[in-house]
Amino acid sequence: MSRILFKILAALVAAFLLYNLWVLGHIIYWRDHNPGASSFMNEQLARLQQDDPEAELRHKWVPYDKISPNLKRALIASEDARFVDHEGFDWDGIEAAFEKNLKKGKIVAGGSTISQQLAKNLFLSSGKTPWRKLEEALITVMLETVLDKRRIYEIYLNVIEWGNGVFGAEAASRYYFRTGASRLSSSQAAKLAAMVPNPRYYDEHRNAPGLARKTRIIQRRMAYVELP
């Protein structure tokens, strides 16, 4: 019986190592090649095609230099103020989120950095399990080790969800404001950043209570952001 358990454990460890080598290989490749669809994008496309087999995602890759500095500043101001300084994990932000959730008695805040969000979007499903959190942490370390901050941010800006089937800065800019990502104004960029925590909801409720207030707060913080 113990030999059977050992073989099962060995097989699981081998599968874990092989999967993470596969992930690492992709990340190394992405140093100078752009990713195609992320795991999360594929998951959302499958969801949309359950209702409409012809459904397609709105997505177009654009280089880092073709994205407005306003949007770059707005997202860091909203999602990860210490992005250029930390190594993938903002421990102060995690502690603050934990204390806020503890005080409210439910999860109302997250401490995920841009690198952690990217790890989830690129490789993981939307489910929440201890295994997924462990894998997210490992992938985050790989991203931060292999890629520089600018490349991490460029990929993030191009794969982040911004609405029902809307992914990336260029698609979001054209979907909401009928302009390219390079031409976004400060207020437009701040509004897009404000939508990120719940993009499909804000896609359907663009005048939702609190969205305008959050947009103004982000816009005020943008001047203090350091870009990679």
From Swiss-Prot:
EC number assigned by the record: 2.4.99.28
Primary location recorded for the protein, binned into one broad class: membrane
GO molecular function annotation: pentosyltransferase activity; peptidoglycan glycosyltransferase activity
InterPro entries tied to this protein: Glyco_trans_51, Lysozyme-like_dom_sf, PBP_transglycosylase, Pep_trsgly
Keywords assigned: Cell inner membrane, Cell membrane, Cell shape, Cell wall biogenesis/degradation, Glycosyltransferase, Membrane, Peptidoglycan synthesis, Transferase, Transmembrane, Transmembrane helix
Coiled coil: none
GO biological process: cell wall organization; peptidoglycan biosynthetic process; regulation of cell shape
Cysteines paired by S-S bonds: none
SUPFAM superfamilies: Lysozyme-like
TM region(s), chain numbering: 8-28
Pathway named in the protein's UniProt entry: Cell wall biogenesis; peptidoglycan biosynthesis
Topological relation to the membrane, as annotated: Single-pass membrane protein
Cellular component annotations (GO), alphabetically ordered: peptidoglycan-based cell wall; plasma membrane
Catalytic activity annotation: [GlcNAc-(1->4)-Mur2Ac(oyl-L-Ala-gamma-D-Glu-L-Lys-D-Ala-D-Ala)](n)-di-trans,octa-cis-undecaprenyl diphosphate + beta-D-GlcNAc-(1->4)-Mur2Ac(oyl-L-Ala-gamma-D-Glu-L-Lys-D-Ala-D-Ala)-di-trans,octa-cis-undecaprenyl diphosphate = [GlcNAc-(1->4)-Mur2Ac(oyl-L-Ala-gamma-D-Glu-L-Lys-D-Ala-D-Ala)](n+1)-di-trans,octa-cis-undecaprenyl diphosphate + di-trans,octa-cis-undecaprenyl diphosphate + H(+)
UniProt-listed Pfam families: Transgly (PF00912)
Locations listed in the record: Cell inner membrane
Function: Peptidoglycan polymerase that catalyzes glycan chain elongation from lipid-linked precursors.
Assigned protein family: Belongs to the glycosyltransferase 51 family.
Full protein name: Biosynthetic peptidoglycan transglycosylase
The organism of origin for this protein: Chromobacterium violaceum (strain ATCC 12472 / DSM 30191 / JCM 1249 / CCUG 213 / NBRC 12614 / NCIMB 9131 / NCTC 9757 / MK)
